[in-house]
Amino acid sequence: MKSWVRQGRRLVLVGMLAWVLLFLALLSYFLDARVNEPLTSTGSVLYQHPDTRRLASIQASQLHNTNLGSRPELASTLTATYTRDEPRPSATPEFSLEASQSPDSAPLAIYGGPEGIHQDYLDPQSLAAWSSFGTENIGSQSDPVIQSRERTSQNHGSITRYRGGEEEEEEEEEEERQENEDEDVANGLRNTAARKPGGDSSELEKYYFSKSISVVQRLWRGHVSADMLSPRLQRAMKDYVSANKHQVSYRGRRRPSQSAKELLCEMKAQARLQMVDGTQQPFSSLGWASLVPSLPLEQLHKRPDQGSFKSCAVVTSAGAILRSGLGREIDAHDAVLRFNAAPTEGYERDVGNKTTIRIINSQILANPNHRFNTSSLYKDVVLVAWDPAPYTLDLHKWYASPDYNLFGPYMEHRRAHPDQPFYILHPRYVWRLWDVIQGNTQENIQPNPPSSGFIGILLMMTLCEQVHVYEYIPSMRQSDLCHYHERYYDAACTLGAYHPLLYEKSLIQRINTGPGSDLRRKGRVTLPGFSTVDCDI
């Protein structure tokens, strides 16, 4: 009897122990499932943001990239982006979903599923902001590449702040030291990559990401080449050259060694403003002569024998302008040019609040998310729109098939607001600027229109006696934040894939008359207006 009771107690204890173990196992399972729940769940507020969905799709697709063949559209050569902490503008405004719904938010979306991989290719203008270095998702802060990059940024800040008359010499020594350090890191990464199956992809990409600081330093010195880009972006450039969407056929001379004065005079001759004025077909038959502004842009504020303005500021949308404190300096100019949907409200301390001219690409007019007809961004300013057109200047083809339909919204806006100066750049003007870039570059550049930034700079050099350009060539504040007003980060927003940004910036640096300290500390380039350049022509 006692033996039976003792055995029963043992069975009860074993059963209780089994239930406890089962409970712990179930608890552990559900806790792990909760911890591992991706940010892209439908319950995540972050994932409700359309840009975040695109970025998550790109990141998730990295494992499939080796299955993607070479495509003319290039999207497969562009890289994943990643989100971090939100940018902190001077007044720390609230970030609205609308502000980040720009079509410029990602180069493409790649979706993997049971039926294979599907890619949504974004338009060329969207690719403008997603262009420089090929990058993977960056790992932890213990990564030697990240630590090296952080040390570089800190060293530049302290060295520039405290050195005196020996500034240039010490900076060159620091740059050389950093380049040697980066090379050591690169050798280690190459060796690591070589030991792994598949070779040189992810670790070597981190190396190219770490080189972004030294690339900017070379840009400060005016030394640029496509070899500075990652292999991924070099392939992208080659594919764009092969695709040649706009049928570009350059037959001009190559003069990469022109002096600053010679380059300025060539720019002055080629960059004569030309707008769609309604005198050419098909616009003349559509009555555009009475639709466009009667006064040319260069005569809006014309003074006798001078440019329209004495001093002008071109404010790019780069994230590096955050925490610059340049707002008051920017607003002190006679005229200020801004781009696309870049706001000023909430960012006044860094970017100012004056806007005289706003250059907008055709997406702004065509995409209802930009609220072109209702947003205050596009009111009480001079508007200049542009859209890529064939290199052959076939206006009939352009009108019938623009990249984005800007013509209908333009006509509607002009009829509703006839007193607001609103122009469309003639394709001849845009492609002449491209000819200048290619003619002064030994390498073959992308056969795509220049960026809005380059167009805006040359436009203001026509209208102003002196032009200050902010953060077109990055300062020591260089950041992975693509735009100061949007919440996405990528190292691929500096030197271009679709637009020939690398070569554009090299040309601007060649004609920069400002001191090197302005470029490093403020990201400011000083350029003479064309009216002040004597070319004897």
UniProtKB/Swiss-Prot annotation:
Q: Which residues lie on this side of the membrane: Lumenal?
A: 32-537
Top-rank taxon, per record: Eukaryota
> Which of the residues are on side Cytoplasmic?
1-10
Where is this chain's protein located in or outside the cell? Golgi apparatus, Golgi stack membrane
Q: Where is the composition biased (Acidic residues)?
A: 166-185
Which class of enzymes does this protein belong to? Answer: transferase
Keyword Transmembrane helix assigned to the entry: answer is yes
Provide the function of this protein.
Transfers sialic acid from the donor of substrate CMP-sialic acid to galactose containing acceptor substrates.
Q: What is this protein called?
A: Beta-galactoside alpha-2,6-sialyltransferase 2
